[in-house]
């Protein structure tokens, strides 16, 4: 008998004594590889140390991720406020968008009127965790900290967005029906909803910026897609249609989502490969998040050389996979893939230079090579 647990539920896996109900093994299932690193780490350690507590697991994880100096405090914060069922859940699975059953729908956590108070007290730990940032100096540790910081900020922003959406819908519900009132009365009622719509757009922008700051794997790209496909059509699309119908004119620019990126500029690789086949070219995909991404001048460069060597870097200008999308490709040729290689990405922007990984060029990303695996 095998006990199968989703790793999203295994922060306190030591509570689940599978043997008590006849299970003789434990299998972890996950679908967000990087994002469930704490659970994977804890699950791997527990069989060797059954006295391991949740606090212990977080302490060990954060010591490796962001350094010994802040690991204890970070572990205390997460163990008390973000551990398993302690973590607030601002989204839900399906039930909102017609015909869609899946994750990523923002959950309404407000009372359903214009006098709501967002339940933010459960997110006090977000600022407590963020305050640790000033104590981190290592570029690599700081980069990893920022990813986890963005993840918890996403949850808080989702709660705010859910409340702002609820307030807007409460106002829209008060607009007289078309067959029961004059056009002027409907327009006047709709205009009273514009401040709520603007507030929703602003809070949604903050959510998207935090979500994009958390992207580091294909799994987090899936989180972006979930919101875009399951929540935004109703929250932003339908409410826009309803308001414009009542107003008799398009919404003002402030009530529309921004068309330019407003978040923290980033350059990164999605789930970078650690191993490649000897003598076979390696394609590298870089993602640039910047308001300058539409500019031909904002083009990343791939720098590579044999691992551990002091020879000059081979510089390869990356080319866009699709115009204006911020996804760039470059290839390390087969001739260079005879042994382990190291590489990093850089991009010159107005006023700043972005690099990936954050420790580059001193500590670039490494790819080992091996003979092809026979299948």
What does each model-found stretch correspond to?
Residues 236-375:
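Glycan-association/targeting regions that enable binding to alpha-glucans and other polysaccharides
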């Amino acid at each position: 008998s095998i006990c199968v647990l989703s790793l999203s539920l295994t922060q306190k896996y030591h509570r689940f004594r599978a043997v008590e109900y006849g299970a003789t093994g434990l299998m972890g299932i996950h679908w967000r590889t990087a994002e469930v690193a704490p659970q994977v780490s804890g699950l791997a350690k527990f069989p060797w140390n059954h006295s391991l507590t949740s606090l212990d697991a977080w302490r060990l994880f954060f010591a490796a991720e962001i350094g010994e100096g802040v690991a204890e405090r970070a572990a205390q914060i997460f163990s008390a406020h973000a551990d398993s069922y302690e973590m607030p859940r601002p989204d839900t699975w399906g039930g909102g968008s017609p015909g869609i059953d899946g994750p990523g729908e923002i959950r309404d956590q407000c009372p359903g009127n214009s006098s709501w108070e967002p339940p933010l007290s459960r997110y006090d730990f977000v600022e407590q965790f963020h305050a640790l940032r000033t104590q981190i100096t290592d570029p690599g540790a700081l980069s990893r900290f920022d990813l986890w910081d963005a993840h918890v900020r996403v949850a808080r922003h989702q709660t705010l967005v859910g409340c702002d959406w609820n307030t807007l819908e409460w106002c829209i519900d008060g607009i007289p029906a078309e067959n029961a009132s004059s056009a002027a009365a409907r327009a006047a009622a709709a205009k009273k909803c514009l401040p709520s719509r603007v507030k929703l757009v602003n809070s949604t922008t903050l959510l998207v910026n935090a979500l994009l700051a958390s992207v580091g794997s294909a799994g987090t790209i899936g989180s972006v897609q979930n919101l875009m496909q399951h929540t935004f059509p109703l929250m932003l699309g339908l409410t826009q249609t309803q308001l414009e119908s009542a107003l008799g004119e398009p919404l003002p620019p402030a009530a529309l989502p921004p068309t330019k990126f407003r978040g923290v500029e980033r350059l990164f690789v999605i789930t970078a490969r650690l191993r490649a086949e000897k003598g076979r070219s390696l394609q590298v995909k870089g993602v640039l998040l910047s308001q300058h991404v539409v500019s031909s001048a904002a083009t990343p460069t791939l720098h590579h050389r044999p691992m551990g060597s002091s020879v000059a870097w081979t510089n390869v200008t990356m080319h866009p996979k699709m115009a204006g999308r911020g996804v760039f490709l470059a290839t390390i040729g087969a001739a260079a893939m005879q042994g382990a290689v190291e590489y990093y990405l850089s991009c010159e922007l107005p006023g700043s230079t972005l690099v990936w990984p954050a420790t580059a060029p001193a500590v670039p990303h490494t790819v080992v090579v091996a003979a092809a695996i026979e299948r």
